């Protein structure tokens, strides 16, 4: 039985994980939803085949990244908008469309091989955007679980980087 460790605390990530647990037969799915629950020793003891880090903001140790198949979801069309606060940074830059990218984690931030990428609109409320992220994240994850791939390397020459915005910097008021 395949063991899948799902790590994340955001509602949209937890919704993806719950759907995977319900719909992916033949898997032992464990969900970790707080920083206090997650540790390298927990990962070693559980010994998962795959770790999903969706909606997770803390640094993951090199020992976990190097010894397990770790997949991350990033709400941009990587390699664009690597780094923190991708949604806020895209909206501030005037982007109308974004994407959901699933990729294998590597030692470099948001730079691993892409296993799924699909465009999504940034229109509507933040809840509308989170709903799209959830839908595409689930779609991409199930696609990967059913037909694993090694992924496609990112085009480094197209990479852009952004810093995480503070809570105050992340409050965005859009004008009609």
Language model segments and positions:
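One-carbon transfer enzymes
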Residues: 1-176
């Amino acid at each position: 039985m395949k063991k899948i460790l799902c790590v994340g605390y955001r509602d949209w990530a937890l919704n993806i994980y719950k759907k995977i647990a319900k719909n992916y037969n033949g898997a032992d799915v464990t969900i970790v939803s707080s920083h206090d629950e997650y540790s390298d020793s927990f990962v070693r003891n559980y010994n998962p085949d795959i770790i999903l880090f969706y909606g997770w903001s803390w640094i993951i140790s090199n020992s976990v990244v190097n010894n397990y198949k770790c997949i991350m979801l990033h709400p941009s069309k990587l390699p664009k908008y690597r780094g923190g606060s991708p949604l806020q940074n895209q909206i501030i830059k005037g982007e109308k469309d974004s994407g959901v990218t699933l990729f294998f984690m590597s030692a470099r931030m948001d730079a691993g091989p892409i296993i799924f990428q699909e465009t999504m609109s940034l229109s509507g409320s933040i809840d509308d955007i989170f709903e799209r992220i959830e839908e595409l994240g689930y779609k991409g994850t199930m696609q990967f679980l059913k037909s694993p791939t090694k992924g496609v390397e990112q085009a480094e020459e197209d990479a852009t980087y952004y810093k995480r915005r503070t809570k105050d910097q992340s409050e965005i008021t859009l004008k009609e």
